Amino acid sequence: MDDWKSRLVIENMLPHFNMVGNRQETRKLQESGTSKRRQEGENFHFTGMADGSYPNKIKRPCLEDVTLSMGPGAHPTSLSTEMQMPTLNMNPTSADLGVAGQSLLLENNPLDSNVVNSSAMGSPFGVPSTADTGLKGHAVPYYEKNNSMPAVDQELQDLLEELTKIQEPSSNDLDLEKILGSKPEEPLVLHNPQAPLGPPAKLPVQMPHMESLGSSKEFASSCSQVAGTSLPIMPSSTGMSYSIPSSSKQIVSSSSSTAQAQVKNQVQNMLPVTMPPLSVPQWHHAHQLKALAASKQGSATKQGSNRNWSSLPPPGLSPPYLPVPSPHPPPPQPPPPPFSPQNFTASCMSSSSLSGSAVQSSPNALLSSMAPSSNASLGPTLPYVPAKLPGLPLNQQPQFSPQSSILANLVSSSVKSPQGHLISALPTSTPGPSPPYRPENLSSPGLPQQSFTPQYSLIRSLTPTSNLLSQQQQQQQQQQQQQQQQQQQQQQQQHQANSIFKPMTSSQQPKTLSMIMQQGLSSSSPEAPEPFTFSNTKPLSHFVSEPSPQKMASMSTHSRQSSLLHYLPQATPAHAPSATASSTATATLQLQHHHQQHHHQQHHHQQQHHQQQHHQQHHHQQQQHQQQQHQQQQQQQPDQSSFLLQQIMQQPQRFQRMMASDSMPALPGQGCCHRCAWTSTALWLEHQHQQWNSLTSTHGHVPPSNLTHVDKACKLGEARPPHVSLGRQPPSRQALGSESFLPGSSFAHELARVTSTSSYNTSEAAPWGGWDPKAWRQVPAPLLPSCDAAAREAEIRSYGNDP
């Protein structure tokens, strides 16, 4: 511990040495003063990684790396790469330089930072490769530690919290990088500080090349290629060194998976297995890949490390995820091999120490959640990374996109709830990651999301439940996955049962969260996700596309409902009522039209009816309010509501047909028939309302008998869009809608009075005593027809039959 602290101090000093290469390093180091302190503790963690005695702390550095990368947010991967690169550079000087300089560059210019990194930081990056090599030595213990460390969650949570609070992840990353890089690097790379610097120069070249490739793709490629060279951890380079390595593939799969939703569980479970592979054999390759990844990440960071989390090099990561990029990296790859030992360190750093040792794995899960980790996980957590990088798709399935994990409190964060929550918060701030969570994004990025099959099964289960994930992601991801699967089934059932109501129920909570995130994030996520989705995600895109349509459908339904809701004063409480309301509103309008005819026929009864109706409407309003509350409660009971909606939606058709037959006769002679048919309809409505009440009676409101079909009609009418009630029947609309007509007939007057009073906006309506066209106007149009129809129905039901 003390030794490492001294090393940290030395590393802190080293950045000054590196300052020759990069002046910003000192400033960065100063910025990271506290970060370094933290990293010193983390250094202990790394020591723990090396020694196996500080697993948690190791994780912390990983988290720092991951979260720091997240902090920049733009390029979690880039940041991670930066961090990793510098740490790898820990050739004591260049590493710090690379880290600090790159961090500064990242902070200053996410896009330029890569270029700067290429030059000033480029060498640091190159060194990071060396540093990776240096880290490599510890990388094995690091991974192993990660595997063995259950404290990862706590550490990750702490780190995430700190990261959330700290927006200078670059400085933290630099410190961590220095710590990580210096610790492994010092053993491996310290002897080579300048040599890494030389390679760093190469790395800068490679980095520019990667940059040219589109840092993400190149990064992925380089990682992949290095992976080919050093299959194990190159993915770390690509994705945090998780993905690409072939030998690392197990690690990648496991790491990715672990980094993914199961970062913790899988990391602990799989990483143990995969970590060993990452160990020495992969380290070399991983370090090489790491060097490439560091340079790549540098470019990725450059792209917008802070800006677009989803924009992150996730695309780059994604490419790494695809081995295809692997050939791409060949140019950078050669330098990485020189640094392969350090590269591995960078890889570990990169991938949050690759799979990042379980410790970093969790952080890596965060990183993964962030693009970088996603990249790192790309190989291992291909699903997780794609989910994350594609995050867009992921966003649909919170499953594993950084966005998803973030939005959904990170499925991955579900895996590590604390991280997930923190990252959720972080990614939440970064809409980019969140959008992947969005189902909408899922369709486009979602493809990549599920393109990562390893956890695709999980992702698929999560994808449908992404909305629920947003709600439940706070829970353990495994539990979430199970629950989400169940919920997904339920949602699917509900969706099938009632696509309209389903958005209500499933989206009520997720809707706000997932809908907002989906909408807001989906816009941002498509940007980053698309790159990810390119070749990586497309293979599995067909998988995601299916879930995404559902989510998008639900989303569209949500948007439709939301669009309708603002029309419906009380429709919002119950979306299902709104759906029913539209159909019921039509029936109500028809009834209203019939009632108008009947009303004209029985105009002499209208006075009494109106009074009674007025009385009823007061009672009815109360009932409606109760019903509204009840409906709100009903929404909480989606199953009943959906079932009820189905019945209502089905019944309204019959009711409409009945009403249509009723509306046909306009002659007074047929008035009785209208009355009878309408009465039967009213009874049917009442019965339906009773059913509704029985379904929702658990919350108990006015007894169904007390609640007349009029009440239900008013409620439904309110719920339904105003245009529906007015537009369905021109006659009733004329009677209700045209003031010239309304004042013309006592029916109009009564209707106006009833309407104004029956509407929930009765406060605006004129007194019962008289009818005020203006007051009537004040009442929402939809409410007027529906409430009028409801009031009349109440009248007719109770008094309409009296001669």
Curated annotation (Swiss-Prot):
GO CC annotation: centrosome; Golgi apparatus; nuclear body
Positions of the UniProt region annotated as Disordered: 22-50, 292-374, 420-452, 486-641
A biological process from GO: male gonad development
Biased composition range(s): Low complexity: 347-362, 571-588, 623-641
Highest rank taxon of the organism: Eukaryota
Keyword Transcription tagged: yes
Residues that span the membrane, as ranges: none
Function in brief: Transactivates the HES3 promoter independently of NOTCH proteins. HES3 is a non-canonical NOTCH target gene which lacks binding sites for RBPJ. Required for testosterone production.
UniProt-recorded name of the protein: Mastermind-like domain-containing protein 1
Lineage: Eukaryota, Metazoa, Chordata, Craniata, Vertebrata
Protein's gene: Mamld1
